[in-house]
A protein has these predicted regions:
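Mobile-element integrase/transposase regions
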Residues: 1-25, 31, 47, 163, ...
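RNase H-like polynucleotidyl transferase catalytic core
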Residues: 63-70, 85-103, 119-122
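Short, well-ordered alpha-helical microsegments
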Residues: 75-77
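C-terminal domain-tail junction helix/linker
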Residues: 86-88, 110-167
Length: 167
Protein backbone atom coordinates (compact mmCIF):
# COMPACT_ATOMS: atom_id res chain seq x y z
CA UNK A 1 0.00 0.00 0.00
CA UNK A 2 1.48 3.32 -1.04
CA UNK A 3 1.16 6.92 0.03
CA UNK A 4 -1.78 7.61 -2.28
CA UNK A 5 -3.86 5.22 -0.18
CA UNK A 6 -2.40 5.82 3.29
CA UNK A 7 -1.48 9.49 2.97
CA UNK A 8 1.93 8.63 4.49
CA UNK A 9 4.95 8.47 2.17
CA UNK A 10 6.88 6.41 4.76
CA UNK A 11 4.53 3.42 4.37
CA UNK A 12 5.00 1.37 1.21
CA UNK A 13 4.59 -2.23 0.11
CA UNK A 14 7.43 -3.67 -1.96
CA UNK A 15 6.84 -5.51 -5.22
CA UNK A 16 3.26 -4.42 -5.78
CA UNK A 17 2.28 -2.20 -8.66
CA UNK A 18 5.14 -2.63 -11.09
CA UNK A 19 3.03 -3.47 -14.11
CA UNK A 20 2.56 -1.04 -16.98
CA UNK A 21 -0.84 0.36 -17.87
CA UNK A 22 -1.25 0.89 -21.62
CA UNK A 23 -4.04 3.27 -22.58
CA UNK A 24 -5.80 4.17 -25.84
CA UNK A 25 -8.44 6.92 -25.84
CA UNK A 26 -10.58 7.87 -28.84
CA UNK A 27 -10.17 11.59 -29.47
CA UNK A 28 -13.80 12.29 -30.38
CA UNK A 29 -15.80 10.05 -28.03
CA UNK A 30 -13.27 9.57 -25.18
CA UNK A 31 -14.01 5.84 -25.35
CA UNK A 32 -11.08 4.12 -23.62
CA UNK A 33 -9.27 0.81 -24.01
CA UNK A 34 -6.80 -0.25 -21.31
CA UNK A 35 -4.54 -3.22 -20.61
CA UNK A 36 -2.18 -3.92 -17.74
CA UNK A 37 0.98 -5.45 -19.23
CA UNK A 38 4.37 -6.58 -17.87
CA UNK A 39 6.49 -4.03 -19.77
CA UNK A 40 6.42 -1.19 -22.26
CA UNK A 41 8.78 -2.58 -24.87
CA UNK A 42 8.29 -2.57 -28.63
CA UNK A 43 6.73 -6.03 -28.86
CA UNK A 44 4.29 -5.29 -26.05
CA UNK A 45 3.36 -1.83 -27.38
CA UNK A 46 2.83 -3.23 -30.88
CA UNK A 47 0.63 -6.07 -29.65
CA UNK A 48 -1.34 -3.59 -27.53
CA UNK A 49 -1.95 -1.36 -30.56
CA UNK A 50 -3.07 -4.38 -32.58
CA UNK A 51 -5.63 -5.39 -29.92
CA UNK A 52 -6.73 -1.78 -29.34
CA UNK A 53 -7.40 -1.28 -33.06
CA UNK A 54 -9.54 -4.44 -33.13
CA UNK A 55 -11.45 -3.33 -30.02
CA UNK A 56 -12.15 0.13 -31.41
CA UNK A 57 -13.17 -1.42 -34.76
CA UNK A 58 -15.76 -3.56 -32.93
CA UNK A 59 -17.16 -0.31 -31.55
CA UNK A 60 -17.38 1.30 -34.99
CA UNK A 61 -14.21 3.39 -34.73
CA UNK A 62 -11.56 3.27 -37.43
CA UNK A 63 -8.12 4.17 -36.10
CA UNK A 64 -6.48 6.57 -38.56
CA UNK A 65 -3.95 8.29 -36.29
CA UNK A 66 -2.16 7.37 -33.08
CA UNK A 67 -0.62 9.96 -30.79
CA UNK A 68 1.90 8.49 -28.34
CA UNK A 69 4.57 9.69 -26.00
CA UNK A 70 8.20 8.91 -26.78
CA UNK A 71 8.46 5.77 -24.68
CA UNK A 72 10.79 3.09 -26.00
CA UNK A 73 7.96 0.84 -27.18
CA UNK A 74 6.36 3.59 -29.21
CA UNK A 75 9.53 4.70 -30.96
CA UNK A 76 10.52 1.13 -31.85
CA UNK A 77 10.87 -0.03 -35.45
CA UNK A 78 8.30 -2.75 -34.80
CA UNK A 79 5.68 -0.19 -33.73
CA UNK A 80 6.45 2.00 -36.76
CA UNK A 81 6.11 -1.00 -39.10
CA UNK A 82 2.71 -1.91 -37.67
CA UNK A 83 1.48 1.66 -38.08
CA UNK A 84 2.67 1.77 -41.70
CA UNK A 85 1.19 -1.62 -42.59
CA UNK A 86 -2.14 -0.70 -40.97
CA UNK A 87 -2.28 2.70 -42.65
CA UNK A 88 -2.16 4.46 -39.28
CA UNK A 89 -0.36 7.78 -39.06
CA UNK A 90 1.88 7.81 -35.98
CA UNK A 91 2.32 11.15 -34.25
CA UNK A 92 4.46 11.69 -31.17
CA UNK A 93 4.17 14.21 -28.39
CA UNK A 94 6.92 16.73 -27.84
CA UNK A 95 9.39 15.35 -25.29
CA UNK A 96 8.58 16.30 -21.69
CA UNK A 97 5.31 17.94 -22.76
CA UNK A 98 2.47 15.73 -21.48
CA UNK A 99 -0.13 18.43 -22.18
CA UNK A 100 0.36 17.67 -25.90
CA UNK A 101 -1.52 14.43 -25.20
CA UNK A 102 -3.97 16.04 -22.79
CA UNK A 103 -7.00 13.79 -23.33
CA UNK A 104 -5.03 10.63 -22.61
CA UNK A 105 -3.21 12.25 -19.69
CA UNK A 106 -6.52 13.39 -18.18
CA UNK A 107 -7.96 9.90 -18.62
CA UNK A 108 -4.90 8.44 -16.88
CA UNK A 109 -5.46 10.76 -13.90
CA UNK A 110 -9.07 9.59 -13.70
CA UNK A 111 -8.00 5.95 -14.08
CA UNK A 112 -5.48 6.25 -11.26
CA UNK A 113 -7.84 8.10 -8.93
CA UNK A 114 -10.99 6.05 -9.55
CA UNK A 115 -9.51 2.59 -10.14
CA UNK A 116 -5.86 2.09 -9.19
CA UNK A 117 -5.78 4.16 -5.99
CA UNK A 118 -9.47 4.02 -5.10
CA UNK A 119 -8.81 1.44 -2.42
CA UNK A 120 -6.02 -0.73 -1.06
CA UNK A 121 -5.97 -3.92 -3.12
CA UNK A 122 -4.37 -6.99 -1.49
CA UNK A 123 -2.11 -7.39 -4.53
CA UNK A 124 -1.64 -6.37 -8.16
CA UNK A 125 -3.71 -9.28 -9.44
CA UNK A 126 -6.77 -8.09 -7.50
CA UNK A 127 -6.30 -4.56 -8.80
CA UNK A 128 -5.99 -5.81 -12.40
CA UNK A 129 -9.10 -7.97 -11.97
CA UNK A 130 -11.04 -4.84 -10.95
CA UNK A 131 -10.09 -3.01 -14.15
CA UNK A 132 -12.68 -4.44 -16.60
CA UNK A 133 -15.62 -3.49 -14.36
CA UNK A 134 -14.28 0.03 -13.82
CA UNK A 135 -13.54 0.47 -17.53
CA UNK A 136 -17.04 -0.69 -18.43
CA UNK A 137 -18.44 1.85 -15.96
CA UNK A 138 -16.23 4.59 -17.44
CA UNK A 139 -17.21 3.87 -21.06
CA UNK A 140 -20.90 3.04 -20.53
CA UNK A 141 -22.15 4.88 -17.43
CA UNK A 142 -19.79 7.52 -16.04
CA UNK A 143 -20.69 11.03 -17.13
CA UNK A 144 -17.93 12.98 -18.86
CA UNK A 145 -17.58 16.75 -18.51
CA UNK A 146 -16.52 17.35 -22.11
CA UNK A 147 -19.50 15.29 -23.30
CA UNK A 148 -22.09 17.32 -21.32
CA UNK A 149 -22.40 14.65 -18.65
CA UNK A 150 -22.87 11.75 -21.05
CA UNK A 151 -20.73 8.58 -21.05
CA UNK A 152 -18.37 8.06 -24.01
CA UNK A 153 -20.38 5.26 -25.64
CA UNK A 154 -23.28 7.64 -26.29
CA UNK A 155 -21.19 9.43 -28.91
CA UNK A 156 -21.09 6.27 -31.00
CA UNK A 157 -24.58 4.85 -31.02
CA UNK A 158 -28.18 5.94 -31.13
CA UNK A 159 -29.85 5.69 -27.71
CA UNK A 160 -32.03 2.78 -28.85
CA UNK A 161 -29.08 0.75 -30.18
CA UNK A 162 -26.93 0.25 -27.07
CA UNK A 163 -27.70 -3.46 -26.81
CA UNK A 164 -26.28 -4.18 -30.27
CA UNK A 165 -22.95 -2.55 -29.47
CA UNK A 166 -22.63 -4.02 -25.99
CA UNK A 167 -23.21 -7.63 -27.02
Amino acid sequence: VGHRITGDRRIQARGIGWEFVHVAVDDASRLAYVEVLPDEGGVTATQFLWRARAWFRRHGIRVRRVLTDNGSGYVSDRFARLCRSAGVRHLRTRPYTPRTNGKAERFIQTLLREWAYRRAYPNSRHRTEALPAWLHYYNWARGHGALHGRPPITCLVAPNNLVAVQS
